[in-house]
């Protein structure tokens, strides 16, 4: 029986999710269609309702609707509740369920490059993207997890929810890290957060949650210019998609060849 999925966001034309899920479908021999839905700021909640009334099986949610999707759900997973935003929706026993697969997607992609246990990790930014990855990063048992933000007040809000983290401003960063994660939206507008030179002195591995399939993101290029190994978030996109696919279809697809295929363009 043909299963129906979609991703909703605004903008949405650039989304790689349909390509990724179709490759998962071919690999697992599951018949499905996966569409793009342009979100309507006024009618978003109605769009969600209509999708499931019309026998939709699962829905991915991207910017700027993750918070509204979270609030719409009746049942949320623990990691979704901690993130405060949702990117994966489905109906079960006539109730809307929500999960957030971004964090586990990040951890699985990072594991290709380095071990997180006992590492000193810096997250740039204290918005929704940062909030969604803190819990899974803490589960990996780093030595220290520091969140830096332009305004300290926003970082302090995160510390109230996650007392284990340290917070600082961009201007007062400690001297070295093993891993720097860019969770700001700067790369989306081709800008970078200028960091003190000392931040790169230990040659940390650098990771941008944003991705650009055709060229390096601004942060990745900035980090490489500082002598660091750096990658964008395309791998995270594929891994979070695999987790959503598993939630909906109870089959975990393989991701490595799909990521290699997407990187080859």
UniProtKB/Swiss-Prot annotation:
Q: Does the keyword Oxidoreductase apply?
A: yes
Q: Which GO terms describe its cellular component?
A: cytosol
For the biological process aspect of GO, one term held by this record is: chorismate biosynthetic process
Keywords of the record: Amino-acid biosynthesis, Aromatic amino acid biosynthesis, NADP, Oxidoreductase
The active site consists of: 66
Q: Which reaction does it catalyse?
A: shikimate + NADP(+) = 3-dehydroshikimate + NADPH + H(+)
A single Pfam family, by name? Shikimate_DH
**Where along this sequence does the record place binding of NADP(+)?**
125-129, 149-154, 209, 233
Q: Which InterPro entries match?
A: Aminoacid_DH-like_N_sf, NAD(P)-bd_dom_sf, SDH_C, Shikimate_DH, Shikimate_DH-bd_N, Shikimate_DH_fam, Shikm_DH/Glu-tRNA_Rdtase
Q: Which HAMAP family match?
A: Shikimate_DH_AroE
Provide the family line: Belongs to the shikimate dehydrogenase family.
Query: What name is this protein filed under?
Result: Shikimate dehydrogenase (NADP(+))
Q: What is the lineage of its organism?
A: Bacteria, Pseudomonadati, Pseudomonadota, Gammaproteobacteria, Legionellales
Give the gene that encodes this protein.
aroE
